[in-house]
Swiss-Prot record:
The gene is brd4-b. It comes from the Eukaryota. Keywords: Bromodomain, Chromatin regulator, Chromosome, Nucleus, Repeat, Transcription, Transcription regulation. Residues 542-597 are annotated as: BID region. This is Bromodomain-containing protein 4B.
Length: 1362
């Protein structure tokens, strides 16, 4: 009965809260039953909470029910009525036990769980269901208590759904603890509380909650009452009362303090459970209790933050918390174990990472610094900053407290941060790697024992990330590790950094597949594997680092020799030489790395293999120390900013190397996606930043180096020879190119010999072509012909071979200026067809800028310079290529024209150098034609030339070119014999020497604009042979406006790139040199061609032309391709010389329709020397054109705004022209005239286009006007019919009205006219509205002409930009 009274008193305290709900709900039912004596008899004893005779059993599901389900329900705001048994006396519920046969409450369930009353989870769940069912049975459905029970039940079911599916039995640990703790009423609960709280590290905060709740009112009395009855009471009753007072306490970290009402009693028991709890584990742990208390205070924050972790995962949270309890004891035990076993776990590391135990004294200083750094890492992991996720690792796992009996079987080498810290303080670690292996062992244990999705695993990953980040930033000094692989300091630290992530991943993978028996060996294997990987990465990095300073090999040999002779002097000399030689080392680096886009990496890999110079590290200390300081020197903000800008300048293929550098040196970014990496310079190590800086500057230096080289050749051949090997190669190549022309038969062989030279030169300039021709860069064919031919210096100095259009130096310069962004569709077209004699200088040389020339606007000539060559289609295969494009075939003379200008177009001429040249490769075009007369046509390379021409001379130059179309063949009659190839180079040199001095060296750049123009002219001539005729006189004055500029451009072009044809003709008549005017000049209507050049072609030359006509399939496709480009690649169009001009698409189809133009060959007629040839009338459409288009072409309405667009660089060109020309005045005149002609033609084309457009617009307007007229006529017809109907109806109405008037004679006369006039007025109004609407439509229709609007806008924009 005392128990009952105790219960009653206890329940009174809580019933004060419950009266409001339960009392109110049940008072109506219970009022009649008032007899008090009956109440105590009805008050049945509380349910049994222990089974002393039955063995206790604990399962994971029961543990979950206690620590997660019950804990969550207990905290719910509606839980208070269910926390204690129903007090029928207090609530006056005499019939309660009649209706409810098995009362149940959460307090009882809690006691039963704590006392291991349940055999399995199902029994406990049954008790919960009983409690809810009792509430629903006894109370009315709408009562508040029922609603509260429903809310609790919903939460209960939700938590049950998350319960582990399989029930596994756990060892029962706490019997003894409870027995000892009976001295205090709360003892039975305290062990549980300490276990739970230690699991969450809440035990530390357990001391605090009791202190705060003391302020809670009125609850101290219940504890007093509880204490009085407790001695006589049985176990169950003892356990029961504390449940009420202390249940809140056990969850104190989570429950608000007002719920922890009766905790005044708690402070005293807390130490006791802790005391006996260690006693159970190890009696020696008593002294550590005080320290535990201290630590608790430090950890008060963690329980609250990680509350949910413990709720959701009671077991997992426990493994870490126990560390809080017996930290030092278990630490002491584990430490001896670890001492015996650590060497095993670390065996792989010492041999790998410390193979040289001899110089320990030196290492000690360095490792001491590293170990100090490691001690700082440990301190940081113990700091509050990381406490939220580091706390489970502070102390060893308390196996007994947590009931983890299989822990020692699975984890053979336990480890925790406390043990690591003690070992660090005791100097047990010899180096940083030992320390790192222990830390990683701790994490791997965690991953192995816990499931991958466990909270503790997540916390371990976070903490490991922190550790790896800090460890990666360990100072680079302890680079003793590099000893196995010498020299590069940055190598070793990175590998050590890299290991951690793999170990964590390896261990986490182990965790999923761990076996009790072989776990130890697996762990050791994983560690060994990780360390081997680390070493391998270190070796790779060092190889990469060593591969860059390749030229150190000779240095090392010299050092060894010096060592033998002068050991002391050697160091000084080495330091001196190291500084001196580092720049050369870098140069080779460049050649290695830069060697063509992607190949750069391949080039780097081989050097390490060949690098046998490991013995050299001994002398290198001075240099390496300096290099180390340089590498590790921190970067300023400005340097970082500059570095980021430089990285952004790099082409795509170089960025891959940047990512590799970062990932190899930054472990945190090692596993990041290489395609997309975010770089934060603040987090990168100084050594990484320095390495990036070194690489980026080397790349950019190579990028700029080509321009320097471009200037170098301008000073002369001798200078080129003397300065750099690459330039000497280019100069030798120039000689070979010249000799190639003289001796075409030997060219193929020498090509093959010269592969390496060309390749090396290609590799020097990959940066300029990263996107353009990476595959060709790797191609071997395209040799420098240096070996067999005399160097250019052997030629007379007065013949600057560098100016030769085929000269390799020009090619070289062009290569250096290749734009990286050449459109691929242009690139692809030129690949398969470049003339072999040009191919020998494979990478076309884009024009180099001359100092004296103004800066050139972007134009196709610059773009077309570096057309990429497809490796799949080498020139050797090019001859068969032409057939696929037969429909493009222009007249046979096309080949002829193009040949004239092949050599005048450096950017295109030198496009591709793959494959041996055809037998007559080096010969000028007319000689090649003679060869062709005896050979089947295989001139596909020339096709490529034309393709390149197409690229450069796209749309903008189309118009002027057309006017020039039909005169090229007349200008250059083929020579009578195929002999005399040799004088060509000399003649070209002399010719260039005679040209104005300002221009010579800058051939590459200066010509940029003219070549495209000439080529297009040629192509258009070939495409429109039927258009030959006289130029419309109305256009002559337009052309004259541009004479000065054209004159300059063509003269410049003429000086720099006399075409091979011109060169040959210079020597043609009698072998004496002769000034050959530019092809444009010869076609100029105002300047008569030279008499010697205009005499009719010899029959020999004519016949080759005819045969060429049959055989030039290769060339024939070209013009069409160009035309198509003009139509389809507008992106290139604006870059033309005259941006305002646009191609005229209507002409293309008709021109290309058929080979009808091929037969007439009107352009082969001999020319009179004195009579200027007038260019064909541009306005005349091709023969195939429909009449409509002919009419459109006839009117030429010049548009003023576009005239000025051509004269952008007038001043600069004029400046070039004003220089005193060395050539005879006739040549100057001819060039000026040809330029004038060119300008005139360009203007005419522009005007013709405008006229065509204007005509089209007029035709459109006429069509619209006709439509309007038609609609108007239709409206008129409709109106007439309508009017006829209306008149008929009106007459009928009038007749009816008259009849009515007669019938209704009594009505006044006035209304009748009004009635008859009314419909007439309506009709008139309708007609008036219709007419207004029609006129409005008519007025509005012509007001908006979109074509006219766009034309106006275009004119405005052109004026704006001109």
């Amino acid at each position: 009965m005392s128990a009952e009274t105790g219960l009653g008193t206890r329940l009174r305290a809580t019933s004060v809260m419950g009266d409001g709900v339960e009392g109110a709900q049940m008072s109506g039912q219970q009022q009649p039953a008032q007899p008090q004596p009956q109440t105590p008899m009805m008050q049945t004893p509380p349910p049994e909470i222990a089974r002393p005779n039955q063995p206790k059993r604990q399962t994971n599901q029961l543990q979950y029910l206690l620590k997660t389900v019950l804990k969550t329900l207990w905290k719910h705001q509606f839980a208070w009525p269910f926390q204690v048994p129903v007090d029928v006396v207090k609530l006056n519920l005499p019939d309660y036990y009649k209706i409810i046969k098995t009362p149940m409450d959460m307090g009882t369930i809690k006691k039963r769980l704590e006392n291991h009353f349940y055999w399995n989870a199902q029994e406990c769940i049954q008790d919960f269901n009983t409690m809810f069912t009792n509430c629903y049975i006894y109370n009315k459905p709408g009562d508040d208590i029922v609603l509260m029970a429903e809310a609790l039940e919903k939460l209960f079911l939700q938590k049950i759904s998350e319960m582990p599916q399989e029930e596994t039995e756990l060892a029962v640990v706490q019997c003894k603890g409870r027995g000892r703790a009976r001295k205090e009423q709360d003892a039975s609960i305290t062990p549980m509380r300490t276990r739970v709280l230690s699991g969450s590290l809440g035990d530390k905060s357990a001391v605090k909650p009791p202190v705060t709740p003391v302020s809670k009112p009125a609850t101290p009395t219940p504890p007093a009452v509880i204490r009085a009855p407790t001695p006589p009471q049985t176990k169950p009753q003892q356990a029961h009362p504390p449940a009420i007072t202390q249940a809140p306490i056990s969850f104190s970290p989570i429950i608000s303090q007002d719920v922890v009402v009766p905790t005044t009693v708690v402070p005293t028991p807390v130490p006791q459970p802790l005391a006996n709890h260690p006693a159970v584990i190890h009696t020696a742990a008593q002294p550590a209790k005080t320290k535990k208390g201290v630590k608790r205070k430090a950890d008060t924050t963690t329980p609250t933050t990680h509350d949910p972790l413990h709720e959701s995962s009671p077991l997992p949270s426990d493994p870490k918390p126990p560390k809080a309890g017996p930290r030092k004891e278990s630490g002491r035990q584990i430490r001896p174990i670890k001492k015996t076993e650590v060497p095993d776990s670390q065996l792989p590391a010492p041999p790998d990472l410390h193979p040289q135990p001899a110089p320990i004294a030196e290492k000690d200083s360095k490792t001491s610094e590293q170990l100090r750094y490691c001690a700082g890492i440990v301190r940081e992991m113990f700091s509050k900053k990381h406490q939220a996720y580091a706390w489970p690792f502070y102390k060893p796992v308390d196996v007994e407290t947590l009931g983890l009996h299989d822990y020692c079987e699975i984890i053979k080498h336990p480890m925790d941060l406390g043990t690591i810290k003690v070992k660090m303080e005791n100097c047990d670690y010899k180096n940083a790697q030992d320390f790192a292996s222990d830390v990683r062992l701790m994490f791997s244990n965690c991953y192995k024992y816990n499931p991958p999705d466990h909270e503790v695993v997540i916390m371990a990953r976070k903490l490991q990330d922190v550790f790896e980040m800090r460890f990666a930033k360990m100072p680079d000094e302890p680079e003793e590790a590099p000893a196995p692989v010498p020299s590069p300091a940055p190598g070793p630290p990175a590998p050590s950094i890299k290991i951690p992530p793999p170990t964590s991943s390896d261990t986490s993978s182990d965790s999923s597949s761990d076996s009790e028996s072989s776990s130890d060996s697996e762990e050791e294997r994983a560690q060994r594997l990780a360390e081997l990987q680390e070493q391998l990465k270190a070796v790779h990095e060092q190889l990469a680092a060593l591969s860059q300073p390749q030229p150190n090999k000779p240095k090392k040999k010299e050092r060894e020799k010096r060592k033998e002779k002068h050991k002391r002097k050697e160091e000084v000399e080495e330091t001196r030489k190291g500084r001196i030689r580092e720049p050369p080392a870098k140069k080779p680096k460049k050649s290695v790395q830069v060697s063509g886009g992607t190949p750069s990496i391949k080039k780097e890999a081989p050097p390490p293999v060949t690098r046998p110079a490991r013995p050299a590290p001994p002398p290198a200390p001075c240099e390496s120390s300096e290099e180390d300081t340089q590498r590790c020197r921190p970067m300023s903000y400005e340097e970082k900013r500059q570095l980021s800008l430089d990285i952004n300048k790099l082409p795509g293929e170089k960025l891959g190397r940047v990512v590799h550098i970062i990932q190899s040196r930054e472990p945190s970014l090692k596993n990041s996606n290489p395609d997309e990496i975010e770089i934060d310079f603040e987090t990168l190590k100084p050594s990484t930043l320095r390495e990036l800086e070194r690489y980026v500057t080397s790349c950019l230096r190579k990028k700029r180096k080509p321009q320097d080289k471009i200037e170098a050749p301008t000073s002369g051949i001798v200078k080129v020879k003397s300065y750099s090997s690459s330039e000497s190669e280019s100069s030798s190549e120039s000689s070979t190119s010249d000799s190639e022309e003289s001796d075409p038969e030997t060219a193929p062989n020498q090509k093959k010999k010269g592969h390496s030279g060309r390749e090396s030169r290609k590799h020097h300039h990959p940066m300029q072509q990263p996107l353009i021709a990476p595959p060709p860069v790797m191609k071997p064919p395209s040799p420098t012909l240096a070996p067999s031919y005399p160097p250019p210096s052997s030629l007379d100095s007065s013949h600057p071979s560098l100016h030769h259009p085929l000269h390799p130096a020009n090619v070289f310069e062009a290569v250096m200026q290749l734009p990286p962004d050449l459109p691929p569709h242009l690139a692809g077209q030129t690949e398969h067809c470049s003339p072999p004699h040009l191919n020998q200088h494979a990478l076309t040389s884009p024009p180099a800028l001359h100092n004296a020339m103004p800066q050139q606007p972007s134009r196709p000539s610059n773009r077309a310079a570096a057309l990429p060559t497809k490796p799949a289609r080498p020139p050797s295969a090019s001859p068969p290529l032409p057939p696929p494009q037969p429909h493009h075939q222009p007249p046979a003379h096309v080949h002829h024209h193009h040949h004239h200008h092949h050599h005048a177009q450096p950017p295109h001429v030198l496009l591709e150098d793959d494959g041996p040249p055809s037998p007559h490769t080096g010969l000028p075009s007319y000689l090649q034609q003679l060869h062709k007369s005896q050979q089947p046509p295989t001139q596909s390379p020339i096709h490529s030339l034309l393709t390149t021409v197409k690229v450069q001379s796209q749309a903008p130059m189309a118009a002027p070119a057309q006017s020039m179309r039909h005169h090229q063949p007349l200008v250059y009659p083929p020579p009578s014999s195929s002999a005399s190839p040799a004088p060509s180079p000399a003649s070209s040199h002399i010719h260039q020497m005679q040209s104005p001095p300002v221009v010579p060296q800058q051939q590459p750049a200066g010509q940029a604009p003219p070549p495209p123009q000439q080529q297009q002219q040629q192509q258009q001539q070939q495409q429109h042979p039927a258009l030959q005729g006289t130029l419309v006189s109305s256009h002559q004055h337009h052309v004259q406006h541009q004479q000065a500029k054209q004159q300059q451009v063509i003269q410049h072009h003429h000086h720099h790139h006399p075409s091979p044809r011109q060169q040959k003709q210079e020597t043609y008549p009698g072998g004496h040199l002769r000034e050959a005017p530019s092809p444009l000049l010869l076609h100029s209507p105002q300047v008569p061609p030279y008499p010697g050049l205009t005499h009719p072609p010899s029959p020999q030359s004519v016949q080759p032309k005819k045969q060429e006509m049959r055989g030039a399939l290769v060339l024939q496709p070209q013009p069409l391709v160009m035309k198509e480009d003009k139509r389809h690649s507008p992106s290139v169009r604006p870059e033309g010389f005259s941006p305002g001009m646009r191609p005229e698409p209507p002409k293309v189809p008709e021109v290309l329709k058929g080979p009808s133009h091929i037969q007439p060959r009107p352009d082969l007629k001999p020319m009179d020397g004195g009579r200027p040839v007038r260019p064909p009338d541009q306005s005349l459409p091709p023969q195939g054109m429909p009449e409509k288009e002919k009419q459109k072409q006839e009117p030429k309405t010049p548009v003023a705004p576009k005239k000025d667009l051509k004269i952008k660089n007038m001043g600069s060109w004029a400046g070039l022209m004003q220089k005193p020309p060395v050539t005879p005045t006739s040549a100057g005149k001819s060039t000026s005239d040809s330029f004038e002609l060119f300008r005139r033609q360009a203007r005419e084309k522009e005007e013709r286009e405008r006229a065509l457009k204007h005509q089209a617009e007029q035709a459109e307007r006429m069509r619209r006007e006709q439509e309007r007229m038609r609609t108007r006529e239709d409206d008129d017809v409709q109106d007439q019919t309508r009017k006829a109907h209306e008149e008929a109806r009106r007459r009928q109405e009038q007749q009816q009205q008259q009849q009515q008037q007669h019938v209704q004679s009594n009505l006044p006369a006035a209304p009748s006219p009004a009635q008859s006039s009314q419909p007439i007025m309506d009709q008139r109004e309708m007609a008036r509205k219709r007419e207004q609407e029609r006129r409005r439509r008519q007025a509005m229709a012509p007001s908006i002409d979109m074509n006219f609007q766009s034309e106006l806008m275009e004119i405005f924009e052109q004026n704006l930009f001109s």
